[in-house]
């Protein structure tokens, strides 16, 4: 069975969306991580998390390195909004200098997940699947 690493976005009480008083992205992603981990484990997946404690502050590169040996890395976030209702879902997949099969699979997975998440959240607009250019020195430059 596949191994999945979940990253609960930010840490502590960080990133208030501004629209809803008392809402912090870090709290939401930490709670969602717990639900998602439990659900995936019930389906038989081996699931790890990048942080053992909500207040643990790790650099992005450290969180990414903790996913070595896993088949899928999911980083949870919720962007600020200008209204109380969710506007749209955005899923990002990585695009590297030397695209591999894994990059294409991540894009396909994002395209399949986006409409399901949007329907569940009841968003106003269609979901967006976006490229996130990254060069973690896979090509050696």
For the regions a protein language model found, what residue spans apply to each?
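Short glycine-rich His-centered loop
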Residues: 2-22
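Active-site-proximal helix/loop segments of hydrolytic enzymes
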Residues: 2-4, 26-141
């Amino acid at each position: 069975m596949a191994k999945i690493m979940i990253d609960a976005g930010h840490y502590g009480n960080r990133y208030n969306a501004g629209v809803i008083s008392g809402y912090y992205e870090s709290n939401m992603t930490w709670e969602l991580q717990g639900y998602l981990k439990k659900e995936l484990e019930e389906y038989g997946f081996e699931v790890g998390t990048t942080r053992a404690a909500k207040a643990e502050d790790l650099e992005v590169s450290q969180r990414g390195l903790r996913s070595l040996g896993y088949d899928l890395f999911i980083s949870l976030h919720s962007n600020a909004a200008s209204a109380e209702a969710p506007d749209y879902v955005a899923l990002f997949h990585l695009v590297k200098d030397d695209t591999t099969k894994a990059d294409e699979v991540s894009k396909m997975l994002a395209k399949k997940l986006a409409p399901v998440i949007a329907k569940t959240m009841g968003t106003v607009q269609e979901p967006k699947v976006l490229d996130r250019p990254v060069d973690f020195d896979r090509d050696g430059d």
